[in-house]
UniProtKB/Swiss-Prot annotation:
It comes from Burkholderia mallei (strain ATCC 23344). One of its GO terms (cellular component) is plasma membrane. Keywords: Cell inner membrane, Cell membrane, Membrane, NAD, Quinone, Translocase, Transport, Ubiquinone. It is a peripheral membrane protein. NDH-1 is composed of 14 different subunits. Subunits NuoB, C, D, E, F, and G constitute the peripheral sector of the complex. This is NADH-quinone oxidoreductase subunit C. Transmembrane segments: none annotated. It comes from the Bacteria. Its EC number is 7.1.1.-. It is found in: Cell inner membrane. Its main location: membrane.
């Protein structure tokens, strides 16, 4: 008798065919990678096909692969990752779609398929700058409206670009350039044979 994950994998391969760029099992979960051009069609089929039945989107996030694998990674930089749940079939699926342009990452919105994607897509836009084409209200959700950049991108400076503080003379919050100085932290090297009673 086939396990639940083997059944799901067989159903996905039969339903999606060549539209599945890859389908990998790791840590007891399947990850499906699809092209951005097939993304909406595949998402609808994942929801509507009774052999799959993913009626719930439980999470969606952005990923920046710029420094993935210590810089050895040579694929697209940004991806949107969905986590889907089928209550009827009691199985889960991770779906990954890569944006083709690293400078302006654009991925179709799945809000019309799973309305729970609304705020998740806004969060991925706010933090990673991934534009979800067709989203009804794509605006920042976590950072300030005047915020510059996208803070979860790997090239975003740790200290940010500006800092805000309350100015008692102006009686309002003001923005100013960052005043934090970058520091080089040198790791401590212990050169003793016995440190803290430990034998080497």
């Amino acid at each position: 008798m086939a396990s639940k994950i083997e059944t799901l994998k067989a159903n996905l391969e039969a339903a999606l065919g060549a539209r599945a760029v890859s389908l990998v099992e790791a840590v007891g979960e399947l990850t499906l990678v699809v092209k951005a051009s097939d993304y909406l069609e595949v998402a609808k089929q994942l929801r509507d096909d009774r052999s799959l039945g993913f009626e719930q989107l439980i999470d969606l996030c952005g990923v920046d692969y710029q420094t993935y694998g210590d810089g050895a990674y040579d694929g697209p930089r940004f991806a949107a990752v969905l986590h889907l749940l089928s209550v009827a079939n009691n199985w889960r699926l991770r779906v990954r779609v890569f944006a083709s342009d690293d400078d302006l990452p654009i991925v179709p919105s799945v809000v019309d398929i799973w309305n729970s994607a609304n705020w998740y897509e806004r969060e991925a836009f706010d933090l990673y700058g991934i534009v979800f084409e067709g989203h009804p209200d794509l605006r920042r959700i976590l950072t300030d409206y005047g915020f510059i950049g996208h803070p979860f991108r790997k090239d975003f400076p740790v200290s940010g670009y500006v800092e805000m503080r309350y100015d008692p003379q102006e009686k309002r919050v003001v923005y100013q350039p960052v005043t934090i100085e970058p520091r080089e932290i040198t790791p401590r090297v212990i050169r003793e044979d016995r440190y803290g009673g430990l034998k080497h």
